Amino acid sequence: MAKKEVKSSLLDNMIGVGDTVLLEPLNEETFIDNLKKRFDHNEIYTYIGSVVISVNPYRSLPIYSPEKVEDYRNRNFYELSPHIFALSDEAYRSLRDQDKDQCILITGESGAGKTEASKLVMSYVAAVCGKGAEVNQVKEQLLQSTPVLEAFGNAKTVRNDNSSRFGKYMDIEFDFKGDPLGGVISNYLLEKSRVVKQPRGERNFHVFYQLLSGASEELLHKLKLERDFSRYNYLSLDSAKVNGVDDAANFRTVRNAMQIVGFSDPEAESVLEVVAAVLKLGNIEFKPESRMNGLDESKIKDKNELKEICELTSIDQVVLERAFSFRTVEAKQEKVSTTLNVAQAYYARDALAKNLYSRLFSWLVNRINESIKAQTKVRKKVMGVLDIYGFEIFEDNSFEQFIINYCNEKLQQIFIELTLKEEQEEYIREDIEWTHIDYFNNAIICDLIENNTNGILAMLDEECLRPGTVTDETFLEKLNQVCATHQHFESRMSKCSRFLNDTTLPHSCFRIQHYAGKVLYQVEGFVDKNNDLLYRDLSQAMWKAGHALIKSLFPEGNPAKVNLKRPPTAGSQFKASVATLMKNLQTKNPNYIRCIKPNDKKAAHIFSESLVCHQIRYLGLLENVRVRRAGYAFRQAYEPCLERYKMLCKQTWPHWKGPARSGVEVLFNELEIPVEEYSFGRSKIFIRNPRTLFQLEDLRKQRLEDLATLIQKIYRGWKCRTHFLLMKRSQVVIAAWYRRYAQQKRYQQIKSSALVIQSYIRGWKARKILRELKHQKRCKEAATTIAAYWHGTQARKERRRLKDEARNKHAIAVIWAFWLGSKARRELKRLKEEARRKHAVAVIWAYWLGLKVRREYRKFFRANAGKKIYEFTLQRIVQKYLLEMKNKMPSLSPIDKNWPSRPYLFLDSTHKELKRIFHLWRCKKYRDQFTDQQKLIYEEKLEASELFKDKKALYPSSVGQPFQGAYLEINKNPKYKKLKDAIEEKIIIAEVVNKINRANGKSTSRIFLLTNNNLLLADQKSGQIKSEVPLVDVTKVSMSSQNDGFFAVHLKEGSEAASKGDFLFSSDHLIEMATKLYRTTLSQTKQKLNIEISDEFLVQFRQDKVCVKFIQGNQKNGSVPTCKRKNNRLLEVAVP
């Protein structure tokens, strides 16, 4: 028992003060400093009596392991260091053992860790309650309901990556043993305006991003969705990706959680179909169309999105399209139908999307309740966990912040009331004199908001219901008239003159002084958001849907049950929900967790004192401490108190044999503690001043040191004596054992020596006999060897003699043959010399005869005259040829192939050279006429000829078409100003192409832009850039050999641009686009771009390789090529 007490006391090894009730001195500075000191040492939990303060560490800490759960299980609240598990265990044991219904109220601003705190409470309760197959199933369903609700109800905000955008209260039901039976979840005020619009830097609800990131291609195709976030107007793009968040993995977690909770596969698919319909609603756009009566009527621009929504929801397209264009108003038995202008149509679209998602979320909560509710009807114990919005103060505060802060005011009110009530009940229960405590009661603020006569909500409802023109300005005027004199209401236009010159208070705003501080509310949107109107035509269109889930979400659309009453406003609904919640909480024993956000950067190890100070003030933590300390700062049961301090008194140490209260009285009397510093309750000792407790702790610490010294002294003496007696006994035993060992060793030595001597003698005799036998054997072997060597010597001598005889005979034959050969060669040489002399004489004689003849007949030759005649004739022929060529010259057109024929054969080479020189000359003359722009065009045409002539059937039709490049004139069209500003480089091509969808083969119009360094794709409607591909990442362009405009752009594997796969386009200017892409890539990368022309080639779509095959189309397909995705591996293009 002592060991356990020393190990686990709240006051031992304390960093700062674990319970701020004991903080001395108590002020705001010391309170914050205590929290910071504990935060820096990873002590994120601190007590205010039974209230737990939790500071968000923004990182994982090893303090929630199963071992920690066991440490806090069935332990006294103050027995261990502060922890959320201690409060959870206290609440669970009170529910199980004392049959008291519990509620755990978790409050704090957004990002303070409320959602995580609620998860920890539920996980602890699940870990410590009973086991069994049925119990485990209930626990698992309760825990897995959280991921489902977080996916549909949480979103990333600037303050919190997983901010709850709805309030959740869960009643967990237990049986008499403390085992969970089920639960009931209530949700409050889902922030449905986030569906259609999100502030900058924030995201829509998680489920939209999880669905697009984690769903399979088959599911996306079924839901008619694409993975590209930019395709949907309701999704913010600047924060689509969140660091450290894997939306794909979270989607799998949500699907698994839905299955565990009890959703069937058809139900889960129906939910995802509604989510997809909400996403696609945001893509519906309207255009004005004038009617004959002069009024503008809204018409849908592109009905493809509307068609897909109707296919998803099984709604008649005509009915839904009319609901977006007309509004029907019913009054008694009259119906009036009016057209909607474009602004009203957009309002109707957004209202439908918000209502569809909000009702889906409510249906999810009800469906989860059906699965987790208790199946038995026996009496149940209940533990409620409240996780609701924290107090919100933004730069722009609207109706949502007003409602949220109203809820927090009510929670603060019940916190003050229940805290004081609990404190008072404990004093009465312990029979301690009660001291009245003064505190700020925020009931006046709650009354300002909720008063049925002149409260802000009542006036807002009155303004929404009155006939005539109702605007936000008229509502503000009404507030200025009724609330002007209220001390917590401020307005620039009120009758109160002190705010007339307040420049911090705009004319279109009002300010309320909440318990957390002053909040400025923008009045814009209060009336619309409170009305929350959905046109009856849209409700009826939804009720007519063939989709069972959607039909069930809009029961008011049933024409047979038309209700002409105005539906309750959002404010009145929320007020009623809060009243029900407060009534529920007041029936339970409260447990509080106050969550604090240490910084706005969502970073670990950063503690912003100013931010924490602000939260401490509006949470009223110092006031809570003062309430706790108003009577007695510390209280403890008699048994643990006596167990902890009994060593301070000789009468109680080491064991007290009487009642624990008597022991504590003896102890305090012995220590001479003043009587006014403490009081004895029925089961507890109450200490008034923290200094008294710290004095007890100092005395206990000093006494523990003295006891430790005494224990060490006695232990060392006992250890030395024990060691001496052991050594003495050991000496006797060792001597006896040594004598035995010495005799035994001597005997063994003698015995082993005799054995060694015997072994040596036997060995010597054996070796002697062995030597004699070996000598005899060697003698016999030596005689045989000598005889063999002698016979071998005789044989080798005979062999050498025979070889010498044979060698002498061969040498004689060789010498004789060499001499005969030498003689023959000399004779041959003599005969050759004689023959050469005879031939030389004959040659000299012939030359001599020729010389004599030439000398005799030289006077008869006319060599000079013939040469001159030949040269003259040749010159005349050439002159005549050139004069004729001058008169017969062809035209200067480079394509003219005419050329005069040659008159003589010997002029053939000259004729051809002249033709070549003339053609080069006229080509140069032709080129000199062109400007640089014309030269570039002809170079591109020449490049196109080399790439596609006789290879692509489409090429001949492109020869006569000039290459323009900029078909869209982006610089002149104001629609594309944003696109023009986003591109700083020179635009080489600007053309509208059809981008082929990778999933279904359908085409989507895109703007194709080619610059010096990049290839870009932009949305044709908005001009927003969808994809940007550096030219260095383009590896190949593939196309067919037929007369079609399809081509594929292949991207480098592993590059960022290739994450979704290659692109497949269709264009009427294929030849021009491919040629310019080839030349630009060559200029940028110094490498030729591979142009593949084949009727069948492969493209990479994400992780799959898909074959693109060109086939001959049927006549019924018309004259336009069509593209169709056959399966995961084949995409066919039918070419007419």
From Swiss-Prot:
Q: Which GO terms describe its biological process?
A: actin filament bundle assembly; actin filament organization; actin filament-based movement; endocytosis; nervous system development; post-Golgi vesicle-mediated transport; transferrin transport
Pfam families from the xrefs? IQ, Myosin_head, Myosin_TH1
Report the residues modified as Phosphoserine.
Answer: S60
Every copy of the Myosin motor domain together lies at 15-701
Residues the record lists as binding ATP:
G108, E109, S110, G111, A112, G113, K114, T115
An annotated Gene Ontology molecular function: cytoskeletal motor activity
Gene Ontology CC, one term: perinuclear region of cytoplasm
Cross-link annotation Glycyl lysine isopeptide (Lys-Gly) (interchain with G-Cter in SUMO1), location: K287
According to its UniProt entry, the function of this protein is described as: Motor protein that may participate in process critical to neuronal development and function such as cell migration, neurite outgrowth and vesicular transport.
Q: Which family does it belong to?
A: Belongs to the TRAFAC class myosin-kinesin ATPase superfamily. Myosin family.
Which named protein is this? Unconventional myosin-Ib
Organism name: Rattus norvegicus
Please name the gene that encodes this protein. Answer: Myo1b
